[in-house]
A protein has these predicted regions:
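Short intrinsically disordered, low-complexity coil segments enriched in acidic
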Residues: 1-9, 109, 240
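Hydrophobic micro-packing sites on short alpha-helices
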Residues: 3-13, 17-24
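TPR-adjacent "capping" and linker segments in tetratricopeptide-repeat scaffold/adaptor proteins
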Residues: 21-34
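Extended amphipathic alpha-helical coiled-coil/heptad-repeat regions
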Residues: 37-240
């Protein structure tokens, strides 16, 4: 079922789309899905050129698809837009309002939707740069560990991002709590992209907490392949 036909019927019959058909069965435009996936997996690293490319993707979505998307997809787009605004140091007033609107609902949940995880990731990001206080940081950090669905690759990818967001903010003494879960995820998915991140945080734990030079050196042996993101996460983090 095409989205345009459903919207037409909804208007003629004066019924919400969700009352006509199961929202999950709506045919989402392939081009939109392509743009969405790129936005979710893209990183700007503060580079203006990368930010510009992502902004062009958002422009295309808002011009061609947004008004015809299901509500859940519209929310997803809005959260991704806010995330880019935060990364690029733009006006985040709307973003903080959006976060406030949905965040307290999320705190009451025991299971998280994909959009919930996006908003949680946004919250941790805002905490990291001082846009949000950390009132719920510890509570949410622990709850996230209880929710890991290894069968859903898209959510697992988001959980990896969330774990990184937690690790760059928790006390060094707590690193292994989160790297243990991170290891389980990488082993279950066979996706070792973030393995250098795990080794980096563990090496810092062994050096600063256990003061075990042998363990530190052994762990650091795995770091020659560390990527720029991993290096920034570890060495730009304030020593505590």
């Amino acid at each position: 079922v095409s989205l345009s036909k459903l919207l037409f019927l909804s208007k003629v019959l004066n019924f919400p789309v969700k009352d006509i058909v199961d929202i999950e069965k709506i045919e989402i435009p392939k081009r939109y899905l392509e743009l969405k996936n790129k936005l979710i997996r893209s990183h700007t690293y503060g580079d203006e050129k990368r930010i510009g490319i992502l902004e062009e993707m958002f422009d295309e979505i808002y011009e061609n698809f947004y008004d015809r998307l299901p509500e859940e997809e519209q929310l997803l787009v809005e959260v991704l837009q806010v995330q880019l605004d935060v990364f690029s140091s733009r006006d985040v007033t709307y973003g903080l309002t959006l976060l406030e609107e949905y965040f307290h609902q999320i705190l009451k949940k025991k299971k998280y939707s994909y959009n919930d995880l996006l908003i949680i990731n946004l919250y941790f990001l805002c905490c990291a740069i001082g846009l949000e206080d950390k009132t719920y940081f510890e509570e949410l950090s622990k709850k996230v560990l209880l929710y890991i669905d290894y069968s859903d690759n898209e959510r697992i990818y988001l959980l990896e991002r969330i774990l990184i967001g937690i690790l760059i903010q928790v006390k060094i003494e707590d690193y292994l709590i989160y790297t243990k879960v991170f290891r389980e995820i990488t082993e279950s998915t066979n996706n070792f992209q973030h393995k250098p991140v795990i080794y980096a945080f563990e090496a810092k734990y062994y050096l600063k907490v256990e003061k075990d030079c042998k363990k530190t050196i052994f762990t650091l042996l795995f770091l020659p392949s560390i990527n720029n993101e991993s290096r920034n996460l570890l060495f730009n983090k304030e020593n505590r």
